[in-house]
């Protein structure tokens, strides 16, 4: 019902707010489908069978995306409204059922519920301006590390994509700025914090496994306690149920069990809180393609009141970033990006500061200028091995490689907190061939935590569960995948493809040690054009060969983890 309402509102806005921009249209953008049959033989269970799949997709454009802005000179008000492309989409998938949705797409965020938004609102006084839209002090959002296989992959989990300044929660206010286009800009922001009360919407009974991470006020022993927030019934405070960790805000559950979790929702919002923060950001472009940005924020907290941890009183956030592109010639270039983040947390109880973040991240790409980036296809490494196995995939919300950048990329993260780099020193190297060699697509990955103490920890006897746990940590990984188009004649093309992914992990304490290795393999060959609109595929997938070994107290244990995988043939008709 809500989507239908937004749909009709958006249609009305086409005629009223955006008279000419963007243009309304009614046309079929995509009408496609496919049907496939696969015969597979599981080499582990020694069983065979058929699998039928059908997919259909209809995309009907109602309106192109666009924007409308006021214009002026000297003293004037700038307002820019942006509308996303509006599209009806209907899908049919035997595995997922049938769906019908009105959707929009903005930037690289995938589906977005915003149809019309204010992009810019500024009062201009020649080169001076006052911005009046909301926003936090998350400086550095436009400094992306140029990783070849996962550029802009996720805007939430930013471990290998970008590193913005800390979120302070002060997002209401204005920005006073001065800008000389293509030279520099400086902005002073004054913002306040709104307070929104929460209330329990419902209570869920959740089954937790042993070792689950628990936070305060997250799970309770009884349903009434979850509603009232009874601290005595909070399992976080029960030493018989949970164990402490290195992080005082997180504990682990000793044994599996079912507990009550309150699901909260926003209640009332108060904007007049007397809580303020200040920020300053500057950006300069001294030469073409070189950009330097520096920003800092300081939290004043509630004026006239005692310092508060909840309000982040006296906290300090700093960001600095540099990115550049240098063209060697028309074929090759380098593209470095370096960022630095610092966050100093003021502890009210001790009246001292504690450094929470002190980290520099750096990315460097050696790019192939004549090859275009690819935002339509995933890398073969992702296609073959999936999100859960790849070093750089760290969140379940990611949906594959967002954009593939032709070239070689190197990434490193350096945590300057005391002793942090002894256990945390991640580096990553990625490669995408682009169109460097005609008909060849190649992808490579190396990732590792090079901290000298990263492998230190308690060693236990090897078992299937221990082996799996070590591999899932992805301590070190190397992967390679490639495909090549072989044109038999004008009609028929054979595309062989192969991928291999090695994952290693280890842990040791004194003479006790354990380690695990896994090599995953996938092969396939597509035959296109033999029959019109049809692709025939022979494949071997989901195969892995692993071994885990441990030596604890002089006793050696080991496990073999071998999955022979599935071989099969597939025929797919598509239009």
Curated annotation (Swiss-Prot):
Keyword line: Cell outer membrane, Membrane, Signal
Signal peptide: 1-19
Main location: membrane
Keyword set includes Heme: no
A Gene Ontology cellular-component term: cell outer membrane
Topology term for the membrane: Peripheral membrane protein
Subcellular location: Cell outer membrane
Reported function: Major component of the outer membrane sheath.
Designated name of the protein: Major outer membrane protein MspA
Organism whose genome encodes this protein: Treponema maltophilum
Lineage: Bacteria, Pseudomonadati, Spirochaetota, Spirochaetia, Spirochaetales
Name of the gene this protein is made from: mspA
């Amino acid at each position: 019902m809500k989507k239908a309402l937004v749909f009709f509102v958006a249609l009305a806005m086409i005629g009223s707010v955006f008279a000419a921009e963007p243009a309304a249209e009614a046309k079929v953008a995509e009408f496609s489908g496919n049907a496939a049959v696969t015969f597979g033989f599981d080499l582990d269970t020694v069983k065979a069978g058929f699998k039928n799949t059908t997919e259909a997709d209809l995309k009907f454009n109602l309106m192109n995306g666009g924007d409308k802005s006021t214009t002026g000179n000297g003293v004037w008000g700038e307002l820019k409204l942006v509308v996303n492309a509006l599209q009806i989409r209907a899908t049919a998938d035997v595995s997922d059922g049938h769906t019908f949705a009105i959707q929009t797409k903005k930037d690289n965020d995938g589906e977005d519920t915003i149809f019309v938004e204010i992009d810019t609102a500024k009062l201009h006084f020649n080169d001076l301006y006052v911005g009046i839209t909301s926003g936090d002090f998350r400086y550095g959002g436009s400094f992306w590390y140029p990783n070849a296989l996962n550029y802009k992959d996720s805007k939430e989990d930013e471990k290998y994509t970008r590193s913005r300044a800390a979120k302070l929660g002060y997002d209401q206010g204005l920005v006073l700025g001065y800008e000389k286009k293509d030279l520099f800009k400086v902005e002073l922001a004054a913002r306040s914090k709104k307070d929104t009360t929460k209330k329990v919407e419902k209570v869920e009974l959740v089954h937790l496994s042993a070792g689950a991470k628990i936070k305060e006020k997250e799970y309770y022993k009884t349903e009434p306690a979850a509603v009232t927030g009874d601290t005595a019934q909070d399992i976080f405070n029960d030493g018989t149920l949970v164990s402490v960790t290195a992080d005082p805000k997180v504990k682990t559950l000793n044994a599996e069990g079912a507990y009550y979790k309150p699901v909260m929702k926003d209640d009332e919002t108060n904007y007049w809180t007397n809580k303020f923060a200040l920020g300053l950001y500057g950006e300069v472009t001294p030469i073409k393609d070189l950009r330097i940005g520096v920003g800092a924020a300081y939290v004043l907290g509630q004026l006239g009141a005692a310092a508060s941890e909840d309000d982040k009183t006296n906290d300090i956030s700093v960001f600095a970033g540099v990115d550049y592109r240098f063209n060697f010639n028309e074929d090759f270039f380098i593209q470095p990006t370096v960022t630095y983040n610092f966050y100093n947390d003021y502890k009210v109880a001790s009246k001292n500061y504690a450094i929470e973040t002190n980290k520099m991240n750096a990315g460097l790409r050696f790019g192939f200028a004549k090859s275009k980036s690819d935002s339509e296809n995933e890398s073969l490494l992702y296609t073959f091995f999936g999100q859960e196995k790849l070093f750089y995939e760290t969140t379940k919300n990611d949906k594959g490689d967002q954009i593939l950048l032709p070239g070689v990329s190197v990434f490193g993260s350096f945590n300057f907190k005391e002793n942090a780099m002894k256990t945390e020193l991640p580096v990553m190297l990625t490669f995408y061939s682009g169109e460097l060699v005609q008909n060849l697509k190649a992808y490579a990955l190396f990732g590792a935590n090079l901290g000298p103490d990263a492998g230190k920890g308690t060693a236990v006897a090897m078992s299937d569960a221990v082996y799996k746990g070590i591999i899932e940590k992805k301590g070190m990984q190397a992967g390679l995948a490639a495909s090549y188009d072989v044109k038999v004649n004008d009609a028929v093309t054979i595309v062989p493809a192969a991928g291999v992914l090695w994952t290693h992990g280890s842990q040791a304490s004194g003479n006790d040690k354990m380690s695990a290795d896994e090599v995953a393999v996938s092969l396939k060959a597509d035959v296109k054009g033999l029959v019109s609109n049809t692709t025939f595929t022979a494949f071997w997938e989901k195969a892995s060969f692993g071994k885990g070994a441990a030596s604890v107290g002089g006793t050696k244990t080991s496990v073999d983890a071998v999955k022979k995988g599935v071989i099969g043939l597939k025929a797919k008709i598509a239009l």
